[in-house]
Amino acid sequence: MTLAALRHWVFDMDGTLTIAVHDFAAIRRALDIPADDDILHHLAALPAEQAAPKRAWLLEHERELAYAARPAPGALELVHALRERGCRLGVLTRNAHELALVTLQALGLADCFVPEDILGRDEAPPKPHPGGLLTLAERWGVEPGALVMVGDYRFDLECARAAGAQGVLVNLPDNPWLELTEWHARDCAALLAQLG
């Protein structure tokens, strides 16, 4: 099966649809999280009274980034082309749902996605857990293998693999994770060109 034949596309947000601007090392320092710890998993493991102010800080920090979001090369054209072809489109992000909506609005893509098909860290387990993709597959009435997960990091590809979906790596010059996917495009414009 070719990617062009697939009709159900799910996108990561930051670094995939947007130009990546998160400084995760600085976020870890600000929240006193060890350098090697996953931010969301670390916060989830904290007692509620310790996690609450850190989550609030993270949400406000990410809000500033969401309002200033800029599209990754070719992202607008890719999403619009897929919508024009009648594809179902979703977002699966480790960001908050409300900020995903702000980001899509800032990019001019808000009308391309049904809000219920935008899953953030509170609507689905954070990637690489496959729960978000499985939720969208069920909602859309398709097998997970009918989904394409487009992302810029191994968590996106691991999520796709665990769900049984197709994973596509974008916005990197090379594919450092060949064991997770053969589908790779240097950016979203190149991915659109591959679709023909």
Role assignments for model-derived ranges:
Residues F24-A25, A72, L76, A96-E98, ...:
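Alpha-helix N-cap/helix-start and coil->helix boundary motif
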Residues M1-H8, H97, T103-G196:
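Asp-based, Mg2+/Mn2+-dependent phosphohydrolase catalytic module
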Residues A51-E62, C112-D117:
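Short, basic/glycine-rich phosphate-binding loops at helix/coil junctions
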Residues M1-Q50, A56:
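Active-site neighborhood of HAD-like aspartate-dependent phosphohydrolases
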Residues I39-L43, E64-L65, R121-D122:
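A short acidic, glycine-rich active-site loop
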Residues E64-V91, H97, L101, P130:
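Short, acidic loop-to-helix structural element flanking the phosphoryl-transfer center
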